[in-house]
């Protein structure tokens, strides 16, 4: 696929649709994919350029595109014999900042990588995710952040069920030389 599209993967913690507001969340990207019975892989490439700076620079003012460039690989495995699935995600984001007066721009690269696991035996639905971020944020701070989640759901019937879940996102405690606040990027923050 080539063009404006929603990128929705796994539990939507990193890439989600978020289509409840007028703008929605769409990416101008090239998405290449391959799938067979048990495996699926996507390669996503995106590049953003402001109209007013097509020639002579690419400074991004606040409120512009959320990233300069993005490269993402997503892989999903679905088992035959048991109700198990596993996904791996790697995303490299080029975040651009600069000075409008000097037209000096800098691109910082932030990497997010992780896994999402599901197991659905009978009336149970168990899933978990873990993601790690490294690289640099827009402010050129070194990043070392993580997010983890687990969820267990049981369906009594088609109408009633119970869910227990736990989420953890690291925060910036101000200690050390690394920025520790995890950025959920383009995920759906509520459903």
Predicted regions and their residues:
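Well-ordered mid-protein domain cores that form the structural environment of catalytic cofactors
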Residues: 1-26
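Short glycine-rich loop/turn motifs that provide flexible caps or phosphate-binding loops at active sites
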Residues: 2, 170, 186
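Signature for the C-terminal beta-barrel architecture of outer-membrane proteins
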Residues: 17-175
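Flexible glycine-rich, low-complexity coil/linker segments exposed to the extracellular/periplasmic environment
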Residues: 175-191
């Amino acid at each position: 696929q080539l063009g404006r599209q929603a990128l929705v993967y796994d539990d939507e913690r990193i890439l989600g649709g978020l289509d409840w507001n007028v703008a929605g969340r769409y990416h101008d990207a090239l998405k290449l994919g391959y799938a067979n019975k048990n495996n699926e892989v996507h390669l996503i490439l995106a590049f953003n350029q402001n109209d007013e700076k097509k020639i002579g620079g690419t400074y991004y003012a606040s409120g512009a595109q959320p990233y300069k460039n993005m490269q993402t690989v997503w892989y999903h495995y679905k088992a035959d014999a048991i109700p198990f699935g596993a996904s791996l995600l790697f995303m490299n984001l080029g975040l651009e900042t600069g000075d409008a007066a000097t037209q000096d721009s800098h691109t910082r690269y932030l990497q997010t990588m992780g896994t999402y696991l599901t197991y659905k035996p009978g009336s149970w639905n168990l899933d978990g995710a873990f993601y790690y971020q490294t690289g640099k944020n827009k402010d050129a701070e070194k990043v070392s952040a993580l997010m983890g989640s687990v969820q267990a759901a049981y369906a009594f019937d088609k109408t009633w069920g119970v869910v227990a879940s736990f989420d953890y996102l690291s925060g910036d405690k101000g200690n050390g030389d690394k920025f520790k606040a995890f950025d959920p990027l383009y995920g759906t923050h509520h459903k």
